[in-house]
Amino acid sequence: DAGADMASVSMHKSGGSLTQSSLLLTGKNVNWEYVSQIINLTQTTSASYLLMSSLDISRRNLALRGRESFRKVAEMAEYARAEINDIGGYYAYGKDMVNGGSVYDFDVTKLSVYTRGIGLAGIEVYDLLRDEYDIQIELGDIANILAYISIGDRIQDIERLVGALADVKRLYSKDPAQMLNTEYILSLIHISEPTRHAQI
């Protein structure tokens, strides 16, 4: 219990339910009937029984085998981190970042990898993995990629990802010194008139 009043859990990412299904968990200090009323005001009252059934099956599976399943997920993620760091040029973030101050804890199921060491932005590696290797990961930004390891993954999937990252480094790496050294890209668009005053 982390003390949150409410938390959303993407069961379709972590628990094996169908895409678009997630759970909203409420703590003991939250009136769940009131939350349900608010949700019914903004969403359909005719929920998808297919999605709800998949959530229930996933919930049952996690209740019966969740600890064992996530132990395997954690082992696969740690294996992936070690293998990716052995490639060189990449850095797979790990529990070594936890310092009790700015980083309190670390979710081992999220495989976050720094890519600028091979001279490529995370979004470039993301695109290469998707387009050239048929591997869809969670996201890529200016410096990192994020892959989500879940109970549906197998060790073969991890090895395929590690092999693809080694291949990307071998075939597409550039000189990291040539990369922009900023976290944010400034907007090049100048808006001459606020939208509310613009005439159509």
Residue ranges and their predicted role:
Residues K13-S14, K28-N31, I57, R116-I118, ...:
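Short, glycine-/Ser/Thr-/acidic-enriched flexible segments
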Residues I189-I200:
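Residue-level detector of conserved catalytic or cofactor/ligand-binding positions
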Residues S54-E68, G152, Q156:
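Amphipathic alpha-helix from the class-I
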Residues E68-I151, K169-S187:
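Conserved small-domain helix->loop->beta segment predominantly found in fold-type I
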Residues A2, S14-L18, L62, V103-D105, ...:
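Solvent-exposed alpha-helices and their adjacent loops that cap or buttress functional pockets
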Residues Q156-A166:
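Charge-rich, low-aromatic oligomerization/scaffolding segments with amphipathic character
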Residues A2-V35, Q43-M52:
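Active-site PLP attachment segment
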